[in-house]
Amino acid sequence: QVYGNKIKRLLVEGDKMNGTKGKMAEAFKELVCKKSFQKITISDIAKESAMTRENFYYHFRDKYDIMHWIFEQQVAAQLPEDEEPFEMWFNALFCNTCEDYKYYRKLIKSLSAEEIRSDLYPLFERRVRLLVQDCLDDSVWNLRKEKEDFSTAFFTDAFLGFYINYIRDHEEIDYNMLQIGLEFLFDKFLSTVRITKEESGEQK
C-alpha cells in the first residue's frame, strides 16, 4: 500500500510537470542557465515557453513563485517519507538536485545567501528535528526542549550550509565521492549516537 501511494504521488507530480505549469517551469530553468535570475522577466518566461503573460500569472505570482514550485515538485516532493533514515533523506536531496544541477547551481550563485537560507531552512529544520528526537534518549530530561532546539538549530545550519556550499563550490557534482563522504559521516558519527542511545535503553 505504501509503494502504491508513492507511485500514485509520483504520477500526479509527473502530470503537473507535463502540463502548462511544467512547460513554463522548463522554460524558466532554461533561462536561468542562460542568464542571471535577476535579469529574467515574466515576458522572457512567457516567450520561452510559447505562452502569454496572462498564462503565467494564472499559475504563478512572480518568478520567485515558479522557482519555489520547481523545487517543491522536483526535489522536496520526491524526498523519502519521515519514517526513512535521515541518511536516505539527505542522500536523496542531493540525488534529486543532480537532475538539474546546472540550474540549481546558477540559482544559488545568483541569489543572496540569506535568500537561499530562508527558503530552505524550514525544510531542513523539520527533518533535522526528527533526527535529533530520534537520537535523544530518556536520560535527557533536564531542559530537554532547550537542548533539542539547540541541537536542531546547530545541525540544521550544518547540513543546510553544507548543501548550499557544496553546490556553489562545485561546477559538477561528483555523486560517487559525495556518497562515500556522506556514508563515512553517517556511519562513524550518527550511527555511534544511535548505538549509544540503544545501549542506554538496554541498561534500564
Specify the residue positions occupied by each region the protein language model found:
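Short, basic, alpha-helical segments at the C-terminal edge of helix-turn-helix-like DNA-binding modules
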Residues: 41-42, 70-79
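Amphipathic alpha-helical packing segments from all-alpha helical-bundle domains
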Residues: 92-95, 114-140, 146-161, 191
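Hydrophobic alpha-helical segments that form the core
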Residues: 146-168, 173-189
